[in-house]
Amino acid sequence: NLSFETSDFKDFKFKKIYLVSNKNENRSIKLSEKVIKFKSHLIKDQEQRIKNQSIECEIIDISEVKNIGENIVSLYPTVGENLDYLNLNNIKLNFLYRKLDQFSWQYCNKGFFNFKNYIPKIITMFT
């Protein structure tokens, strides 16, 4: 359920899909070059799969999101530097929430070690 073509939103008709990359210069905690390269390959792979479905798609840096214009819809980034960047730069997006995330959030209140006890229940719910 993590790739676009099998997500909750696969039947939505989007005009264009932007895949957002967050390079080290935008991060407060720098990632290793191996991690940056791995993430870049994941994004390029997703771009190709979307284009294979004849959907217009472009990879952009997170700093370019503010230049897209209004009426932007995005998967909710939950936590981390992407959400922090959007908030710090006052970038307003209309978020889409995956059913998997919405269901799982109820178990996200006492850290990972408590959450992991619910993983089998979450998997059962979505398989």
Which residue stretches match the model-derived regions?
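Trp/Phe/Arg-rich N-terminal binding region typifying the photolyase-homology
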Residues: 1-127
